[in-house]
């Protein structure tokens, strides 16, 4: 008689792989746009795990497209140069000097760090700015008044991304955009990622954040709502139940669904291997939003 207990660790690992099988089959050849931000970018260990998740996704047939932020690094660089920065309703006032620093940090530092880390982990990542081949076309965002070189994405040159995917590369995109006036614009990374996802008709749009997901009870971090329909998400937003930084993230997910993305996810990037757990397990670890959701449906 074989003593199963002797192989309990190995069996549990095999069970995880078997659980992932229908998801691997479902998403083979699909596109997932992942906004890489929050604590996942600050903690070196978590950052490495995210890179591992991204590379594994690629190897099992899902095509990840990475869009990253970099607010804390930009703040740090501006402070070191004694350049004052102001915000209006979450948008950075961006004059020409600030824009120069934003581009330097996003494109020259963070983008290259993420690209190098993915390559070191075994992937084939290519770092891009939204200015490359007019990847992200922006116009001035005047929603909060004239804040300088703050833009909103009005067009995505999807062919650039699709050509890279076809050749098995992983695009890593910094959210600096080009305007019709040939000026550089600072664009919100979450919104840019959503625009990229919709332009690619992505199956998945994932926001890596510093919160567990959408909560039933704001005082209870364990009360994550694992699945929301599009209608439920809109109702929550309109009910003013959602507050703070979750409002723009939920709006971003809703807009992505309206623009053709099949599934949007808000997950806690502080959880080790959160991407794999959300996409390739039945339960997931965050909140999935879809036009329609069904019981036990994480596909």
UniProtKB/Swiss-Prot annotation:
Gene: argB
Any GO molecular function: acetylglutamate kinase activity
Enzyme Commission number(s) of this protein: 2.7.2.8
GO cellular component: cytoplasm
UniProt name for this protein: Acetylglutamate kinase
Species, as recorded: Petrotoga mobilis (strain DSM 10674 / SJ95)
CDD domains to which the protein is assigned, alphabetical: AAK_NAGK-C
Chain positions of site Transition state stabilizer: 35, 249
Annotated metabolic or biological route of this protein: Amino-acid biosynthesis; L-arginine biosynthesis; N(2)-acetyl-L-ornithine from L-glutamate: step 2/4
GO aspect biological process, one term: L-arginine biosynthetic process
Keywords: Amino-acid biosynthesis, Arginine biosynthesis, ATP-binding, Cytoplasm, Kinase, Nucleotide-binding, Transferase
Enzyme class: transferase
Pfam families per UniProt: AA_kinase (PF00696)
Primary location class: cytoplasm
Binding site for substrate: 70-71, 92, 186
Catalyzed chemical reaction(s): N-acetyl-L-glutamate + ATP = N-acetyl-L-glutamyl 5-phosphate + ADP
Alphabetical list of Gene3D superfamilies matching this protein: Acetylglutamate kinase-like (3.40.1160.10)
Function comment: Catalyzes the ATP-dependent phosphorylation of N-acetyl-L-glutamate.
